[in-house]
A protein has these predicted regions:
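Short, ordered loop/turn segments at secondary-structure junctions
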Residues: 69-71, 79, 108-109, 134-137, ...
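Rossmann-like adenosine-cofactor binding region
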Residues: 232-301, 307-309
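Glycine-rich phosphate/diphosphate-binding loop of Rossmann-like nucleotide-binding domains
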Residues: 74, 79-99, 157, 165-262
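General beta-strand structural signal in soluble alpha/beta enzymes
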Residues: 105, 131-134, 155-158, 189, ...
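N-terminal ligand-binding/catalytic initiation module
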Residues: 1-155, 375, 381, 385-389
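Solvent-exposed alpha-helices and their adjacent loops that cap or buttress functional pockets
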Residues: 12, 55-60, 96-97, 122-124, ...
């Protein structure tokens, strides 16, 4: 199938992938008076007395804003907010289909951090959570940081944290399969953008000690010239031996490669220099850092990509719907590391020890168990970590 042509045709037919459907019928005078004036004044007064009643008297309890500025849309780059709308609508469809969450796309016409933060913060009272999408690095880090400080609802940049949650889930099962522990392995990553940095931070919270991040200029280490503040922060806690050189230099002896960068950056020759039973996450889309066949021919034991036509797809749809479902169910004030880790373990648990093999370390995107298992784990973690409000 020519997905580009067929998708364009469908979008012309759909004229948008979302619509509003009322929950209150207004088919007679009495019903109208209850849903709108004069009856609607009473719930307004209740919310005026206690703003948290907005969760009980409106749809806020189940509604998430999906926010972008259109600067890093899929592999298309900076295409603008309006051009990003089809992706945001699609994300909203996934929220509903896979999490039962109502989501509203908000495409902001500004690249200014303060503009975006102020816009979202002023609208936060209309939503139960905020999902930041396709905002370029390093601005995405500052936008998320400021919004988390200003908003008392979950703010979650899926390009960072959704990818990190799925990667951790897959890694937990891959390490189990090859008999290694996260605290003992050497991991080398390619790509120092939003996803790459979030992955490293989450893995380090799980006990990872030996990790080297690389970018276009090679290994990142403390003191390297030209690092932006975000890379300086990660350099201070990674690459403890201050290894220098290219990806090919530092990947020697590594147990795990995690790529969120560009097509073809990892070669079979590089894989052959890695440790026995190497694990490869080649998540660049649509063309991975290395294709599974080449990686396995070079000695890799487990290979995961971001593509649906290969086994072990790293697909964020396994994470964000259930994470928000769980956070909304307990009216969490934030989505913290404890909740992310709980989601990773929940996803990993859906692959039983009997089923676990080199081509099956992650459940399928359409596995009907995912939402409920992830939501329950996230809600419980929110309660235990003190961010649940009901």
């Amino acid at each position: 199938m020519d997905y580009a042509a067929e998708s364009l045709k469908k979008h012309y037919e759909w004229k948008g992938k979302l619509e509003m459907t009322p929950r209150a019928a207004v088919d007679n005078k009495e019903a109208l008076s209850l849903a709108y004036t004069p009856g609607v004044a009473q719930p307004c007064l209740e919310i005026q007395k206690d703003v948290n009643k907005s969760y009980e008297l409106t749809r806020r309890w189940n509604t998430v804003a999906v926010v972008t500025d259109g600067t890093a849309v899929l592999g298309l780059g900076d295409i603008g907010p309006e051009a990003g709308m089809p992706v945001m609508e699609g994300k909203c469809v996934l929220f509903k289909a896979f999490g039962g969450v109502d989501a509203v796309p908000l495409c902001v016409r500004s690249k200014n951090v303060d503009d975006i933060v102020n816009t979202v913060a002023m609208l936060a009272g209309s939503f139960g959570g905020v999902s930041l999408e396709d905002i370029s690095a390093p601005r995405c880090f500052e936008i998320e940081k400021q919004l988390k400080e200003r908003c008392d609802i979950p703010v979650f940049h899926d390009d960072q944290h959704g990818t990190a949650v799925i990667t951790l889930a897959g890694l937990l099962n891959a390490l189990k399969l090859v008999g290694k522990k996260i605290e003992d392995v050497k991991i080398v990553t390619s790509g120092a953008g939003a996803a790459g940095i979030a992955i490293i931070k989450l893995l380090m919270s799980m006990g990872l000690k030996n990790v080297i991040m690389t970018d276009r200029k090679g290994a990142i280490y403390e003191g390297r010239e030209g690092l932006n503040p975000i890379k300086e922060e990660i350099a201070a806690v990674t690459n403890r031996n201050r290894e220098t050189g290219t990806l090919a230099d530092v990947i020697r002896g590594a147990d795990v490669f995690i790529g969120v960068s560009a097509p073809g950056v990892l070669t079979g020759e590089m894989v052959s220099t890695m440790a026995k039973d190497a694990i490869i996450f080649a998540c660049a889309n649509p063309t991975p850092e290395i294709f599974p066949d080449e990686a396995k021919a070079a000695g890799a034991a487990v290979v995961s990509t971001g593509r649906s036509d290969y086994p072990n797809q790293v697909n964020n749809v396994l994470a964000f719907p259930g994470i928000f479902r769980g956070a909304l169910d307990v009216r969490a004030s934030e989505i913290n590391d404890e909740m992310k880790v709980a989601a990773s373990y929940a996803i990993a648990s859906l692959v039983s020890d009997e089923e676990l093999n080199a081509d099956y370390i992650l459940p399928a995107a359409f596995d009907p168990r995912v939402k409920d298992v992830v939501a329950a784990a996230v809600a419980e973690a929110a309660r235990k970590s003190g961010v649940a409000r009901i």
